[in-house]
């Protein structure tokens, strides 16, 4: 089974399911067969794509799942990301209720700050976040993933909310403290996309002006 992967794709799909509205997804794809397949599949899901096409291979990956439902992902190729220099419809960002950034440069953060709610992941790169000098509404990452672990001393501006997830153990929200994960009595098939789905739900709630202190 082969589908578009990565945080951006999953967040866009989950938001599309939650809101029943058209979701705009700004991304970069390689000008190859994989890039073309990604574009067609995501478009058929009802997602509005704004693509910066690159003369490089589209990044690929495969996921291995163990008997406990835990997954390990192997990635092949360079990570492609849109930049502010790409001729995309950046002007529509100011009309958005909420934006989640998974890959970009610092200038895109500045343009996206016009949205009511702006969230991101540390995987974007702390230097990219700091160089934007933008105050984030939410910084969401896994406290179990070495690629997303960070300390507040590494941030030039402290986000309004920072959430570090820890899978079935719940996680930590700053300010607020530790929270527990909801117990799921269903059979666990796999954990692929759980963190990205969580991030999509969080953005949806914040953009809907739900009180985050109550729901955590």
Model-predicted segments: where are they?
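Short catalytic helix/loop segments, enriched in acidic residues and glycine
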Residues: 1-8
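Short beta-strand segments
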Residues: 63-65, 74-76, 102, 142, ...
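Conserved phosphate-binding/catalytic region of the ribokinase-like
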Residues: 152-216
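Hydrophobic beta-strand scaffold residues
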Residues: 23, 49, 118-119, 162
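Conserved beta-alpha-beta core of the PfkB/ribokinase-like small-molecule kinase fold
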Residues: 96-157, 161, 168-170
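Alpha-helix C-terminal capping segments
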Residues: 12-22, 205-207
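Conserved N-terminal subdomain of the carbohydrate kinase-like
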Residues: 2, 17-97
């Amino acid at each position: 089974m082969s589908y578009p992967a990565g945080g951006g794709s999953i967040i866009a799909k989950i938001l599309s399911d939650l809101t029943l509205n058209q979701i705009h997804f700004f991304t970069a794809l390689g000008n190859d067969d994989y890039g073309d397949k990604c574009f067609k599949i995501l478009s058929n899901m009802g997602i509005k794509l704004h693509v910066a096409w690159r003369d490089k291979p589209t990044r690929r990956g495969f996921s291995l799942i163990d008997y406990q439902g835990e997954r390990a992902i192997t990635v092949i190729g360079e990570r492609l990301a849109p930049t502010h220099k790409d001729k995309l419809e950046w002007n529509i960002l100011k009309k958005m209720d909420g934006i989640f950034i998974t890959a970009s440069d610092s200038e895109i953060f500045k343009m996206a700050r016009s949205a009511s709610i702006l969230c991101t992941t540390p995987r974007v790169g702390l230097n990219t976040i700091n160089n934007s000098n933008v105050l984030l509404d939410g910084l969401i990452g896994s406290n179990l993933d070495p690629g997303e672990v960070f300390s507040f001393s590494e941030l030039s501006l402290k986000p309004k909310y920072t959430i570090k997830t820890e899978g079935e153990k719940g996680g930590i929200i700053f300010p607020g403290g530790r929270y527990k994960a909801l117990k799921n009595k269903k059979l666990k098939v796999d954990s692929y996309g759980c963190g990205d789905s969580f991030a999509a739900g969080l953005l949806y709630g914040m953009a809907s002006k739900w009180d985050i202190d109550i729901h955590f």
